[in-house]
Amino acid sequence: GNGDSPFTGAFKPENCTLKVPFTSISVYKESSIYGIMNTIVPLANITADNEEVSPETTDLLATAKKITISGSTPDALEIQALFASNEKVTSIDMTGVIEYFEVPVAANPNCLVYAPASAQVENNNVVINGTAKKIVLTDAMPFEAPTAFHADAISYTRTIEESLTTNAQETTGWRGIVLPFDVSTIQARNKAGEQVELSAYNAEGEYDTSKNPFWLRELTTEGFAATQTFSANTPYIICFPNSSELDEHINIIGDVTFSASNAEITATPVFNAVEGKDFDMIATLQTVSA
């Protein structure tokens, strides 16, 4: 017979490799099995910012911006728990996962998940075979696309403070903005409670009168200039009307949503400064502390 051990008999255990779930490897190494079969490796391979992660260095996942996971992940939920509180992570590449794929829930709602080609999921912010059905971006959280993809629909929402008095002449009303897609539609709610579409003023002070006006400026070598074009990865300053001197149908408060359909999202570039007359502007899609 083969004796009392399942690893004796027809083969030598020291010449064999036992593959186990990534988060369980320490359990196996502490068991009697490790003394019999001393080559035990995880089923999944994980990197954090291009550095290989071992079961002993999982703390790297707590601060990594880019995570890759490949192989087999029967312990998908346990792996997810290793970076569940990481608000810095902007992408999780799981294209190399061969079985037990689960869409992870990241602390950063803007995190992109690049899923295996065979994945069939409806989650937001998931890219499959170069296409995402829906990307939803949250204000004040980081975003970075390591590789380009097509988005059937993409949107970003910013909340306008009702207490903030804003118009083109009030410097306190202006805010910086940069988005990773060409914006085609901007929608908001006016102070009368109506859902409205917005149109920026042009250099002549004109706008689409079927919509509500707002101010959009880009930096030029002559200073800030009005524009009606909202391009990807370009820094702007923006201002929405909200003043007691204006009609409630013009004033904008609450959520403003910027969106586009069939958008081509490029890999996030290295941003260079845009030169102005008196100062420069540089875009960022990362969280910046004041």
Language model features by range: what are they?
Residues 116-195, 220-290:
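A short, polar beta-strand/turn micro-motif
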Residues 1-145:
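Solvent-exposed loop and capping/linker segments of extracellular ligand-binding repeat ectodomains
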Residues 5, 24-26, 31-32, 54, ...:
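Generic serine detector
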Residues 53-55, 75, 210-217, 236:
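Extracellular/luminal ectodomains and secreted, surface-exposed scaffolds of diverse proteins
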Residues 47, 128, 194-197, 201-224:
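Surface-exposed intrinsically disordered loops and tails
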